[in-house]
Regions:
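Sec-dependent bacterial lipoprotein signal peptides
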Residues: 1-17
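Short linear interaction motif-like sites in intrinsically disordered regions of transcription factors
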Residues: 6, 10, 80, 136-137
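Lipid interaction determinants
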Residues: 19-78, 85-139
């Protein structure tokens, strides 16, 4: 008589174990073209430069975050992102003296916390300083 009860108990315990904890799908990361939109800054000792990427594809660079809305900016222009490949093209300010310096290409890793730049191609020495740096999200 014990065997049927033990068998029933083992079946019920086994079915509970098979259910296990409920798994939840991890939400997908938003596309980089959405994540990049915002303001970022460097932290010392790398500097205090700030940059704003807008949803309309414009970019603005300033000496500090407090100067992002003042004229003239260090540089302004446009950005284009294809996957993790960012092209920044300045049409005013630094990196515009020579035609070949206007655009720089970087591989970026973007998160809620910030953006990390790795240079692919950029002949502008001043902009190239961002190679290997992480800029922290302001907002």
């Amino acid at each position: 008589m014990r065997n049927p009860w033990i068998a029933a108990w083992l079946v019920s315990v086994g079915s509970l174990a098979a259910c296990g904890p409920e798994t939840h799908a991890v939400p997908a990361k938003r596309p980089n073209t959405e994540l990049i939109v915002g303001e970022y800054e460097r932290h010392p000792p790398d500097g205090e430069t700030a940059i704003r990427f807008r949803g309309d594809g414009s970019v603005r660079l300033a000496k500090t975050r407090a100067l992002l809305d003042t004229e003239p900016p260090l540089a302004s222009g446009a950005w284009k992102l294809d996957g993790a490949r960012l092209t920044v093209t300045y049409d005013k300010g630094i990196c515009t003296e020579r035609a070949g310096d206007k655009a720089g290409v970087y591989t970026v890793v973007i998160s809620k916390v910030g953006i990390h730049f790795t240079k692919v191609e950029d002949s502008c020495e001043r902009r190239s300083a961002i190679d290997g740096q992480t800029w922290w999200r302001i907002k």
